[in-house]
Structure formats: C-alpha cells, structure tokens
Swiss-Prot record:
Protein name, UniProt field: Nucleoporin npp106
Gene transcribed to yield this protein: npp106
Any one Gene Ontology cellular component term annotated for this protein: nucleus
Protein transport among keywords: yes
GO molecular function: structural constituent of nuclear pore
Organism: Schizosaccharomyces pombe (strain 972 / ATCC 24843) (Fission yeast)
Record-linked InterPro entries: Nucleoporin_int_Nup93/Nic96
Length: 933
C-alpha cells in the first residue's frame, strides 16, 4: 500500500513539476515577445513619407519660411541705391516657373492620407488609360493597314469591278423562273446585230501608211502616211474568252477608232453593230450587255437613222416631235425586242424538251403551253381554262406575248365559239383590237369591256391569263399590274407595262373615242415607276445588276441607265454613252468641272458627257496618245461640247509631247507632213487662232523643258524660222559642251531630253545642217533668218568638224580649221622672231581680239574653252611628233618655233579672257605651254 501511495505521490510530484516547467516556458515566451517588441519600438515615430513626398513637404516648408522673411535689409538698401525695386524684382523671380517633367506625376499627399480609396481609384485610372492607349494603337494600326491596302485596291479597282460584274452574273436563272430578275439567255435571238456587219467594214486605220483619206479643210498638205497603227484591232484573234480590263479597253478603242474613221470620211456608221460585235467577243459571261445593244438596235434602226438625228431631243420639250419620236421608238423597239426574245425562248424550251420544231406558230405555242402546265397526265393549274385539251387563254396570251398578232387572230377565229362561251363579246373585242393595237378601243366597246373586266375582278377567281388579256385589250388599270401567275419574269412585267404605254397624239386619240390623254399610261409615267422601284426590285438576289440597266433603257431613261451601269461596268457604260451620243439620244448639260456624271435638275436628269469620257481616260494606262485623241474626238458628238474637246486636245498635246505625231514633221522641202490633228479637224474643229496659240504655248514649254526637237517643229509651224535656227544653235552648242573638255566621245549627254519625233531623233549637228540647207534653198524663208544666226550656226558646225578631226588625231587639219574659224588668235603672223620687238604689236592685236570676243553669241562663247583645249592639245601632240624625228632640219625647227609661238599666243589670250574660262583650263594651258619651251 505504501509503495502504491508512494508511486502515486511520485506521479503527482512529477505532474506538478511538468506543469510548472510548461508555465515557466510560456511565461518566458511571452516575456521575450514583449521584450522583443519593446526593443524594436522606435523612440521616434516612423516617417511615412517617400522621397517624392519629402521633396513636396520641403517645398511647402520653404514657401512658408519665405513668406515670413523680408529679405536682407542691407541687400534692400544696396538694390535701392542701384535703382532697382527689390519687391518687384522678387515677385518677377518667383513668377518664373520652370516646368519639370515630373510635375505631372506629383500626387496630393494630403488627399492620399485623408482619402485612402483615392489610391485605388488612381490605380484603376492607370489601368484604364493603358487599355485606352492599347485600343487606340490597335485602331491606328488597323487604319494604317486599311490605308496601305487601299492604295493597291484603288489601283486595281476598275479591273476588280469588271471581275465582280462577271461573278454577279446569275448561274441558275431559267427562262421562266419564279424570280422577278431578268434572265436574258445567250441562246435568245438577237436580230439586226451580227459580226459580219462589222467585219464587212473597212479595217484600214487612219494610222496606216498610205491610207487615202480626204484632207479636211485647213490641212497644209496631202497625207504622206502615218507610222503608228492601233496595236489591237477589232478583228485580232483571241485565245481566251475571259477578257481583262486592258484587253477589253483595247478592243473597244479599236471600235471607237473605226467610228471616227467613218465620221472623218463623212460616212454612215452602224454604231450598234460595231460595238455589239466587241461586246459579244469580250462579254461572254455577261450576255445581258450584248442584249442591250440588240435592244437599242430595235429602238433606233441604224440603217434608217444617222448621226445626230435625235439631237433636238435634249433641247426640246417632252411634247416636241423629236421627243415623241424617241418615245415612240422606245416603246415599239422594246416591245419588238421582248417579243422576239420570248419567241426564241419558246423555241429553246421546245428544243430542250425534244419537241420537233414546227413552222405553225399556233401549234408551237400550244406545245409550249402544255410543256408548262401539263405534267404527268393532268393540268397543274386548276384556274387555266382548257377546251379540247387546249388552254385557250394561255395560248392566246403567249401568241400576243411573242408578237404574233396575226396568228392570235387566226387562233381566235378557229376557237371563236369556245371564246364566246368564256366571254360573250370577246371575239368582237379582239377583232377591234387587232386592227390597231397601239390605239385604245372605240368608246362603246371599251365601256362594255371595262364593265366585264369589273365583273371579272369582282367574282374572281378566273383564269389569270384571261384577266391579263382583258386588261390589255381594254387598257384597264394600267397603273396597277398585279399578275403574279402571268408576269413570272421581269420581261413579262416590262412587256405588259409597255403595252399600256401610248404616245400622246391628241388629235388621233380624241378622234377615236375621246379618251383623255391624262388617263393614258405613257412612257414618262413608266419611267417614274421604274425609278421609284430602284435596282433592288429588278435584282432581289443581287446577282444580275444589268437587269435594272435594261429596264431603264426600255423606258428611255438613257442617262440614268449609263450612270447606273458605270458603277459596275465603266468600260461598257462609256461606250454605250458614245453610241447614244452619236444618235443624239443623251440629254446633256453644259460642261462643269465636277466629278458628277449624272446631274439632277428638278424632275429631269442630264449626263455630264465630257466628265464620263475623262473618268474613263483616267483608267487607261500605257496606251498610245492617239487612243486618247479618239475618245476626245467623241466629245463633240454633242455639239455643245466642241470647246471642251478643243481644250482637252490642247492638254493632251502639251502633256504627251508627241508634236510630230499630232502636228506633222518637217520635210526636206521645208513643208510639213500631215499629223493626226489635221485628220481630226472635222471632229475637233480647231480654228487658225487656236492652233497658233497652241503652237506658241507648246514651243515655249518645249524651250523650258529642253525639248529642242518639239520646239523646232512648233516654231516652224508658227513661221518663225529665225527662232528655229536659234533653237538649233542652242541645241548644237549644248551638244558640243556636253561632250566634255577632256573627252572626245560624241555620245549625247544623259541629261538631255529625248523626244520621239523625227526632228529630235537626228544628231544635233545633222539637224542643224539640214535646217540651214532647207532654209537657204528657199529664198522666202531664208530671208526671214538673220545673218547673225546663220553665221553662228556655220561656226558651230565647223567646231563639230574640229572635234571629229581631233578624235581622228589629224593635228595639222585641226589647227588649220581652227585658224580658218578665226575664233582664237593662233594665226597671227610672226614677221620676225624677235620677242622684244614683236610683243607690243602682238599684245595690241590680242587686246583687239579679246574685245571682239565679247561680241560673240553666248552659244559660240560656250564652246571656246573646248576649242582652246583642243588647240593646245593638238599643238602639243604635233610638237612632240616633230621633236621625236631622227633628223630635225631647218624647216622642222621653224615648225617647232611656230608651234611654240601659237602656244604662247594661246596662253596670252587666255589671260585676257580668264573671267570666262575655268581655272582648270587656265592651268592646263599654262602647264602645256611650258612643255613647249
């Protein structure tokens, strides 16, 4: 027991000791932490300012101290004695504030302590500013990228639009689909336009050699031949059907050239056929553009009408005879075109379906009607009226739609009983309509028909084709055309609308029943309707932009049609405008220098024809200047633009610098050859004063640019032959100087302007010699050339000969010719070789020659340094040759003395005219003269 108690007591003792140890350890830990904190606690509070904060605090303290100080008193007295106001000076000094780049980064320390959340907001602002900077940089990069890409895009925009226009062509259009877009198929008939009609015309170019064309009034000579021919002719062979912009433009340019050839010859030109043949060749994927030429040919018969026949249209009112003639041609031509198109479509569908083509029109249309509405042994349209397996109203409508009115009348006669059952008075209506379909029915019949039509509309449904026929016969509700089962294509819609149009012939209309002209649906109202619909109505799928163009043509809106087509097909639009201007179909406006092709005036629109041509010419690059002239010559097709064409021709001539091509070249008999401008005077009517101003302006510009060949031609045309020789002198002088003082190379300077005309292609010395010979052979023209210029030119020609002899190392001949020129005093005779006696008279002679030197022309003076160099070099070479002879006799010694004398004279003379010589020449002459001693 005791042992057990002892054990328990021992355990308790050990537990108490353990708890004491643990408490002491915890106390020590707590005390040590407290001691650590006491030791680390600073005696002064920790400064919570950074360096920038300390700097700002110091500035604040400094400002407070400065406010309490009044400065040094002695300094005040000292400054006052010197006349300075200390207070004002101090204010001026403290008013100066030098901005530090770190000022904007200083923070308000007080607000930072008082408002701790401000720091968070500032951080957010920094992040936001970084994000904004990043976004702005990205935006600027995108703009720069788009701009750089846009440069290349603008350069190829036209060609791209041409390719896009091809891709927009519908690939799945059917002849009679549900879409309202026009679907003109390549297989459709295109009468009046054949390639043979173009190929049969002469293909000889105005630029061909030997082309016999009559010379227009104002031309100086007959045609000698022109060397340039259009690079791409209309009949050239092509290996591909896909034409780019350049190929297309060159083909149309050839056609425009043929048009101008016909105009110059005063011959008629079949413009529609001419341009259509090009369109058929280059627009194989956009066949509607070719169909547009066919449509225009139906409107304006090119075999009947000629250039400017409808010119009065744009000057007259809409009720004038010229305007009414165009309106009538538009209606009748468009209807004929659409009817022929539909008839060809019938043949195409029957052929595709394997039907045997029949000559009988009625049987053909019946077969086509069954092909459309008879499927799998039953009629697919329950509203179609079928009698004896023949859909009467369908067949009759299609006969009318295809323009076969005689066949339609025969069909009504054949089925008259059946038609009477379906419409009691219908045969009577149709017989009256067939007599003159362009006029309304007599009033009595028209009232009866319109009453039946009202009942037909009231108790619908009826056969939709019967509805359409009644609507056409009675001219019922022409402003409302809602026949979706009949007008399945835009062609159908335009055909019905055009059938409603009537020409406002008041006397004819009133005598046939008194129908008011105000109730007629005329072409003007159709124009407004089509324009109000806009292109989206005729091109809902955005795949055939030419549909709206064709619709505008059909209603006579030629100006809007050209402007709309120009967006996607600028090449075709330009040539459509040229062809229309040929016949006078365009309403134009006085030329204004703006970029608007279409100009709106109240309810009318007019086209800026010159601007259209200029816009097209801007797209042409690397083409012959004659191509530009061809298009400029088309501008006077509108007579009001003759002055504009003259100004554009001046600009073309002055910028192209091809004066010999346009104005002719000089022939050996001093006359000139015929230029292109002579041939085009019938098209671009330059008068004599305008030509003289053009010659003078071009000559001055050529002088400034250093184009001596052009300058010579233009001054020759002006009749200023003395100036011609003066220009030749200047040209020859510069050629001599450009060869250099130390070189005998006869190559022309690289800095000289090169002209493409015949005059400038000759060497300057040959040109000058030819001009001098030509004028001297003609006494009248020679009298107009001054003797001074003749003498100067002859002197320069001899200098050229001196250079050639010098290059051949013919030293004796060089010195003899220089002595003959008498420009340098090396031919002074030495009577006695006594220097002391001869110096005074020789010195006097040299002074006299130096005085004469100042009277020379500048062109002659400029070659003197080169001539002095050649003289001294020849003297030196000849002196060395004689000195190296094995035996030097008395005659050789005299030659050496004469050479020494010539060298001395040359050096003495150079010192008298040293102001006109370069230091290099003077040093060379003096150095070489020493070698002769």
């Amino acid at each position: 027991m005791e042992s057990k108690e002892a054990k328990e007591k021992g355990v308790n003792t050990s537990d108490s000791k353990g708890s004491q140890i643990e408490s002491s350890i915890s106390d020590l830990r707590e005390k040590s932490q407290h001691l650590f904190g006491v030791l680390l606690e600073p005696q002064v509070p920790v400064i919570q300012y950074g360096l920038n904060q300390l700097e700002e605090k110091a500035r604040n303290l400094e400002s407070k101290v400065l406010l309490t100080r009044d400065g040094d008193t002695k300094a005040h007295y000292l400054l006052a004695e010197s006349g300075m106001n200390a207070e004002q000076t101090r204010q001026k000094i403290y008013s100066i504030h030098i901005h530090s780049p770190w000022d904007q980064l200083e923070l308000d320390k007080k607000s930072l302590y008082e408002q701790p959340h401000t720091k968070l907001y500032n951080g957010q602002n920094v992040v936001a500013s970084i994000e904004n900077g990043y976004q702005s940089n990205v935006y600027e990069f995108q703009l720069r990228l788009m701009k750089n890409n846009g440069i290349a895009w603008e350069n190829t925009k036209t060609e791209f639009m041409e390719d896009v226009g091809k891709l927009l062509h519908s690939k799945d259009n059917s002849g009679l689909g549900t879409s309202i877009s026009m679907s003109l198929r390549p297989n459709l008939a295109r009468p009046l336009l054949t390639a043979s009609s173009v190929k049969s015309q002469s293909v000889r170019s105005l630029r061909e050699v030997g082309s016999n064309l009559p010379i227009p009034t104002g031309s100086l000579t007959k045609i000698d031949g022109l060397n340039n021919q259009l690079s791409n002719d209309l009949t050239r062979s092509q290996t591909t059907n896909i034409f780019g912009f350049a190929e297309k433009a060159s083909s149309f340019a050839a056609a425009v050239h043929k048009l101008n050839e016909a105009r110059i010859r005063n011959q008629a030109c079949h413009v529609w056929s001419l341009f259509a043949s090009v369109s058929q060749m280059v627009n194989t994927e956009v066949i509607q553009l070719f169909d547009a030429w066919s449509l225009l040919a139906h409107m304006i018969d090119e075999t009947r009408y000629g250039m400017g026949d409808f010119e009065a249209r744009h000057l007259a009112l809409d009720s004038s005879s010229a305007a009414l003639a165009v309106e009538k041609n538009c209606i009748e031509g468009s209807l004929k075109y659409l009817e022929n198109q539909f008839l060809s479509l019938i043949d195409l569908h029957l052929s595709d379906a394997g039907h045997i083509t029949t000559v009988n029109s009625v049987e053909k249309v019946i077969a086509y009607s069954k092909l459309r509405f008879y499927k799998n042994g039953s009629w697919i349209k329950s509203t179609v009226s079928v009698v004896n397996d023949v859909p009467l109203w369908v067949v009759l409508f299609y006969l009318m739609r295809s323009g076969q009115l005689d066949a339609a009348l025969q069909f009504v006669n054949t089925y008259s009983d059946d038609f009477e059952k379906l419409g009691r008075s219908f045969p009577l209506y149709f017989y009256s309509y067939a007599k003159n379909p362009s006029l309304p029915l007599p009033k009595q019949l028209r009232d009866r028909l319109q009453a039946e039509y009202g009942q037909l509309m009231k108790y619908a449904p009826e056969d939709p084709f019967k509805h359409a026929i009644y609507k056409l016969l009675g001219n019922c509700e022409p402003h409302r055309v809602s026949l979706p089962e009949v007008c399945v294509t835009s062609e159908d819609y335009m055909w019905i609308q055009l059938m409603f149009c009537r020409v406002n012939q008041n006397d004819v209309i009133d005598s046939n029943g008194g129908q008011s002209t105000n109730s007629l649906f005329n072409l003007y109202q159709l124009e407004k309707k089509i324009v109000a619909f806009g292109p989206r109505y005729f091109n809902p799928k955005n795949n055939t932009p030419t549909n709206y163009f064709l619709a505008l043509l059909m209603c006579g809106e030629f100006e809007r049609a050209i402007s709309f087509l120009h967006t996607n097909y600028p090449v075709e639009a330009t040539h459509f405008a040229v062809a229309m201007a040929y016949y006078g179909l365009l309403r134009t406006k006085n030329y204004e220098k703006n970029e608007n092709i279409l100009i709106y005036e109240a309810d009318d629109v007019k086209i800026n024809f010159p601007q259209l041509i200029i816009a097209y010419l801007k797209h042409l690059e690397y083409v012959d200047a004659a191509v530009y002239l061809d298009y400029i010559a088309c501008i006077p097709l509108v007579p009001a633009y003759q002055a504009c064409s003259i100004n554009l021709t001046k600009i073309l001539l002055l910028q192209s610098h091809e004066f010999s091509k346009f104005l002719g070249d000089i022939k050996p008999d001093t006359e000139r050859t015929t230029g292109l401008l002579d041939l085009y005077l019938r098209l671009i009517p330059f008068d004599h004063d305008s030509l003289q101003k053009l010659y003078l302006e071009g000559a001055r510009e050529a002088d400034d640019d250093g184009r001596f060949g052009d300058s010579i031609i233009l001054y020759h045309l002006l009749g200023d032959y003395d100036t011609v020789i003066g220009v030749a002198i200047k040209n020859l002088s510069q050629s001599i100087v450009s060869r250099g003082l130390w070189s005998i190379d006869s190559k022309e300077s690289k800095n000289m302007h090169i002209s493409s005309n015949v005059v400038a292609s000759e060497a300057p010395d040959a040109l000058a010699a030819n001009l001098l010979a030509m004028y001297e052979s003609n006494p009248k023209k020679s009298a107009k050339v001054s003797a001074t210029n003749k003498k100067a030119l002859k002197v320069l020609l001899k200098v050229v000969k001196v250079q050639k002899l010098y290059g051949q190392e013919k030293w004796d001949e060089v010195l003899q010719l220089i002595e003959h020129l008498d420009l340098l005093p090396i031919n002074e005779v030495q009577a006695e070789f006594e220097p002391n006696e001869q110096i005074p008279p020789i010195s006097a002679r040299l002074r006299r020659r130096a005085f004469e030197f100042s009277t020379f022309q500048d062109e002659v003076l400029s070659v003197i340094p080169s001539l002095m160099y050649i003289s001294m070099s020849s003297i030196k070479a000849l002196y060395r040759t004689i000195s190296k002879l094995p035996v030097v006799n008395e005659e050789s010694k005299k030659k050496l003395q004469r050479l020494q004398f010539k060298g001395s004279m040359l050096v003495m003379f150079s010192t008298m005219i040293e102001s006109r010589l370069s230091p290099q020449i003077l040093e060379y002459l003096q150095a070489e003269q020493l070698t002769l001693l």
